[in-house]
Amino acid sequence: MDTFEAISSRRAIKKFDPNHKMTSEEVDSLMKLTILSPTSYNQQNWRFVTVTDQSIKEKIGIAARNQAQPVDGSLVILLCGNMSAWKDDPLRYWQNHPTEKQELVKASLEKKYSDSPQNRRDEAIRSCGFAGQTIML
């Protein structure tokens, strides 16, 4: 399936077969693809919690205004933004770049995020949004 077909054939599913269970291999494959989602400065400032335990999914269903999808779906993925990723070893994904580039990236991260909780929050929301879109495809 190409990108255009994946986008045009995507649908919002409201009813799930509560008896269907994703295999751990399917969940692992999905998450390996999800972590390829883009993030600003390659911060990878999202964290994912996969939930398959039925009792926890029921609690999530209540928190989600009693929607059936979290309860009946095989898997719930909680997307969490890490708002301190910009300072948690930010150059770990830039190791193969020249030192000058690494220094520029670090300075840019500090300038954009050090004094702005709003920027950190907005970036975490964007990054989780990209990851969510990847999951839905």
Write out the residue ranges for each language-model feature.
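Acidic, surface-exposed loops and disordered segments
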Residues: 1-137
